């Protein structure tokens, strides 16, 4: 079972791992829960609802369509989303279409990966990073245990 905290009412919901990727709703308030196996698209308008209210840590991939390294990193981001479904919200922000959020967090180069916990920015990685480097930064956020 995967435990997901509802971002709306803060109730902890237990979801069978077999239902990961399927639509799920909070048992208390009936709002949708993020159980997706793919990154979620974030806009300036939806940033606070998706990232700030997330019940799990968030990996936000800031990218642009014209960026070659962003496209090279995309399969890694997709793999991380599948591997950590239910424990991590993976989101993507097109910086050209959503300059307000990119500016708010000082995104000057892409790709930039922003890591959030409890709605607060806690870490960032700039440039195309290997999966191992990304996982090393995610590990303490997901497990609550810092690496030695």
What are these regions (language model features)?
Residues 6-9, 26-29:
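Short cysteine-rich clusters marking metal-coordination/redox-active sites
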Residues 13, 33, 74:
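Cys/His-rich microdomains that often coordinate metals
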Residues 15-25:
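Short linker/helix segments within small regulatory modules
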Residues 30-38:
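Short Cys/His-rich micro-motifs in 6-15 aa windows
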Residues 40-58:
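A short beta-strand-turn-helix
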Residues 55-58, 62-66, 109:
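Short pre-active-site segment immediately N-terminal to redox-active cysteine/selenocysteine motifs
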Residues 69-84:
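Typically the conserved alpha-helix immediately C-terminal to a functionally engaged Cys/Sec
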Residues 109, 114-147:
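Non-catalytic, surface beta->alpha helical segment in thiol-disulfide oxidoreductase systems
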């Amino acid at each position: 079972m995967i435990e997901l905290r509802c971002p709306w009412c803060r109730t902890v919901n237990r979801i069978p791992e077999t239902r990961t990727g399927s639509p799920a709703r909070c048992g208390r308030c009936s709002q949708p829960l993020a159980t997706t196996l793919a990154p979620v698209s974030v806009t300036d308008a939806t940033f606070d609802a998706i990232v700030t209210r997330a019940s799990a840590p968030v990996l936000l991939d800031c990218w642009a369509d014209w960026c070659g390294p962003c496209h090279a990193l995309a399969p890694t981001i997709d793999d991380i989303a599948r591997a950590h479904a239910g424990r991590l919200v993976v989101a993507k922000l097109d910086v050209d279409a959503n300059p307000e959020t990119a500016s708010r967090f000082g995104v000057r180069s892409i790709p930039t990966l922003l890591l959030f916990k409890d709605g607060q920015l806690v870490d960032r990685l700039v440039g195309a990073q290997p999966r191992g480097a990304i996982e090393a930064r995610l590990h303490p956020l997901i497990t609550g245990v810092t690496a030695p």
